[in-house]
């Protein structure tokens, strides 16, 4: 399966919005006391099927967020959306974080929590049931959600892989 990676998506042509998922403060003990640094996880997306995430580190919060946004624009993927939801159920893992996503009927809404919700909102998915299992570490949950969305196959992908027409795929 060919992955929908940032190689064929030009982020400059997209109207990307950003959503902050998590900020972490780190401390380095030096001779004069503690020196604080920050890292930020940011999800970017156009709410029309493109989503990516980035991690930024800096001595100031705003700089960390800006670096996260720039990093996120480099990692944008295309997500197949069918009638406001995903084509099929997926379970994705990254480390000990596990994310389960199920398609939902129109009108259900976005039922997800925490970091998964931010990813799905930025992707533009309106009707979905999602659950984060295992680790609640926002880094790993975001990476699991993105890898799950990246692994989704729509009917066109399946037809291409099987060297069949779209009609033959639906009949089999």
From Swiss-Prot:
Keywords in alphabetical order: Ribonucleoprotein, Ribosomal protein, RNA-binding, rRNA-binding
Q: Please give the InterPro entries that the UniProt record associates with this protein.
A: Ribosomal_Su5_D2-typ_SF, Ribosomal_uS5, Ribosomal_uS5_bac-type, Ribosomal_uS5_C, Ribosomal_uS5_N, Ribosomal_uS5_N_CS, Ribsml_uS5_D2-typ_fold_subgr
Q: Which GO cellular component terms are attached?
A: small ribosomal subunit
The record's annotation in SUPFAM superfamilies points to: dsRNA-binding domain-like, Ribosomal protein S5 domain 2-like
* Keyword Cell inner membrane (UniProt): no
Q: Name one GO biological process term.
A: translation
Molecular function GO labels: rRNA binding; structural constituent of ribosome
Pfam families per the UniProt record, alphabetical: Ribosomal_S5 (PF00333), Ribosomal_S5_C (PF03719)
Q: Which residues form the S5 DRBM domain?
A: 16-79
Highest taxon of the lineage: Bacteria
Checking PROSITE patterns in the record gives: RIBOSOMAL_S5, S5_DSRBD
Concerning its family, UniProt says: Belongs to the universal ribosomal protein uS5 family.
- Can you quote the domain comment? The N-terminal domain interacts with the head of the 30S subunit; the C-terminal domain interacts with the body and contacts protein S4. The interaction surface between S4 and S5 is involved in control of translational fidelity.
Q: How does it assemble?
A: Part of the 30S ribosomal subunit. Contacts proteins S4 and S8.
Q: What is this protein's function?
A: With S4 and S12 plays an important role in translational accuracy. Located at the back of the 30S subunit body where it stabilizes the conformation of the head with respect to the body.
Tell me the protein's name: Small ribosomal subunit protein uS5
Instruction: State the organism named in the record.
Output: Chlorobium phaeobacteroides (strain BS1)
Q: Which gene holds the coding sequence for this protein? A: rpsE
